[in-house]
């Protein structure tokens, strides 16, 4: 390795150094400065990744800036940046003070940047678990709410189980293949059984991370108890990271028919159970939690195809889903400055009294339902198209039906925003940071709905 090689992993270095600076120097800085430094750090890391050419040469042992990393790192940085912007006004009205919050967001981003660059199983495991550790802390940050601590404890306990599954699975893959390198951890005639078993255990571990049924029970409580901006970051970046881990392993592995049945069951149950459970929810965060279970079922369907089209659909939908959930939870956070608005009924008439935030929330609901001309429609179209083309027609039909059913509970939120009046006073005006973040997420959703070609080209390049 020579020093110039390090420029390809500068996003990792930038986020790591930025997190340490915010944490160590925070007590010496003015209030609010740490959040600004963290936001600039996330933006700088994302821009560096965009303008750095991928390389097949490892920058350091175990870390290579691949085309996939060039796609995912800016996505993670954008999610972290919008989360920090949305957190500014929300945290001022909560007991979430000091430099710990922005520093922990940057530590999570650091691990997220490491993950797509990893070229061996050990670094991959450390990266995905470091992401989880950061979120255990972030979920419990709202000290004024007992639900926040309860959510963090539940997430920690379930995360420990997921970590055990993942570690055991990687150990089996290592035992069978004799190497930690991703390129060498493939099944052969003499080691197929043990490597396939390792794969099965890793999939179960990632099922916890992705909230796939039956490993989904922690999700509604954690989303409900977490601060809304944290729920936005958790429901997007951690999910895309877990799906990307499976994608990275699959791209190095030949098809393994024995894994098809577990993936089919995980996808089928998640799409059906997630959407049916969401129908009964009156709490908007729990509704979005169950809907995220269904959306992860769609991602698993794309992964199941084992085709380039399926993997492209996974990355495309991951990017669009990030924007949709950031918009949804961001609007919830901005509308909950004075008090938590947990129930769908709490949003009655807010489409008129808070038109920007109500409009963004309505747009996010329409996009999550997959209605045109939003990015959600484009994402679902490519998911189901790739599934049908990959021979999973029956599962695609189930997915289409479940997506149609989901329109009911998404439109229920839109109806509450615009078809009901409320006697409650209008919410406080949106902070400038909230407005910028929400407008960026909404613009991304709309632009991808009418002009998805640029993102499709980026996805194609990421799979080279």
Swiss-Prot record:
It is found in: Cell inner membrane. Its main location: membrane. One of its GO terms (molecular function) is NADH dehydrogenase (ubiquinone) activity. One of its GO terms (cellular component) is plasma membrane. It is a multi-pass membrane protein. Its EC number is 7.1.1.-. Pfam families: Proton_antipo_M (PF00361). The chain crosses the membrane at residues 9-29, 39-57, 65-85, 98-118, 121-141, 156-176, 193-213, 230-250, 259-279, 287-307, 312-332, 358-378, 394-414, 436-456. Coiled coil: none annotated. GO terms for biological process: ATP synthesis coupled electron transport. InterPro entries: NADH-Q_OxRdtase_suN/2 (IPR010096), ND/Mrp_TM (IPR001750). It catalyses: a quinone + NADH + 5 H(+)(in) = a quinol + NAD(+) + 4 H(+)(out). The keyword Transmembrane applies. Keywords: Cell inner membrane, Cell membrane, Membrane, NAD, Quinone, Translocase, Transmembrane, Transmembrane helix, Transport, Ubiquinone. Belongs to the complex I subunit 2 family. HAMAP family: NDH1_NuoN_1 (MF_00445). This is NADH-quinone oxidoreductase subunit N. It comes from Citrifermentans bemidjiense (strain ATCC BAA-1014 / DSM 16622 / JCM 12645 / Bem). The gene is nuoN.
